[in-house]
């Protein structure tokens, strides 16, 4: 969000002034959150941007209504969408709406910021998530997306 980005920019500017070192930098992909009902959140590229850039991408989706946690709390509206490169499997964007969307977006953001093989959709397949949680949507979406490659 703009407030969070402005806070980080101010912190980095103060460090540069105090330490005389301006080598620190902000992350490239800053998440957005819209606190409506349901919440909307995203980080990274959109399908429209990837199509315009002619990037070969695939989409993995998870519907919240299929998650145990969403069923338990009665918040079945929502979904998580992961956009990833078809060849490298690098995560390019994550889009979410529904219960806790602005909170769970940071899980994907953390993986997107990893360099090299640390940023792949396979991370979500090979990671153990607490159950039942809304974060489980990442595994469901990752499996959905990888299955589309075959």
Curated annotation (Swiss-Prot):
One of its GO terms (biological process) is 2-oxoglutarate metabolic process. It is an enzyme of class 1 (oxidoreductase). InterPro entries: Class-I_Pyr_Nuc-Dis_Oxidored, FAD/NAD-linked_Rdtase_dimer_sf, Pyr_nucl-diS_OxRdtase_dimer. Keywords: Cytoplasm, FAD, Flavoprotein, NAD, NADP, Oxidoreductase. Binds 1 FAD per subunit. Its main location: cytoplasm. It is found in: Cytoplasm. Its EC number is 1.6.1.1. Conversion of NADPH, generated by peripheral catabolic pathways, to NADH, which can enter the respiratory chain for energy generation. This is Soluble pyridine nucleotide transhydrogenase.
């Amino acid at each position: 969000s703009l407030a969070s980005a402005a806070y980080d920019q101010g912190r980095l500017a103060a460090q540069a002034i105090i330490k005389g070192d301006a080598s620190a930098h902000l992350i490239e992909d800053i998440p957005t959150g819209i606190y409506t009902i349901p919440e909307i959140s995203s980080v990274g590229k959109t399908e429209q941007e990837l199509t315009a850039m002619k990037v070969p991408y695939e989409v993995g989706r998870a519907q919240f209504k299929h998650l145990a946690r969403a069923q338990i709390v009665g918040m079945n509206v929502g979904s998580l969408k992961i956009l990833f490169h078809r060849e490298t499997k690098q995560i390019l964007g994550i889009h979410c709406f529904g219960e806790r969307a602005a909170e769970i977006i940071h899980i994907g953001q953390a993986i997107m910021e990893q360099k090299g093989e640390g940023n792949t959709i396979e991370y979500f397949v090979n990671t153990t998530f607490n159950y039942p949680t809304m974060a489980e949507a990442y595994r469901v979406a990752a499996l959905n997306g990888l299955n589309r490659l075959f």
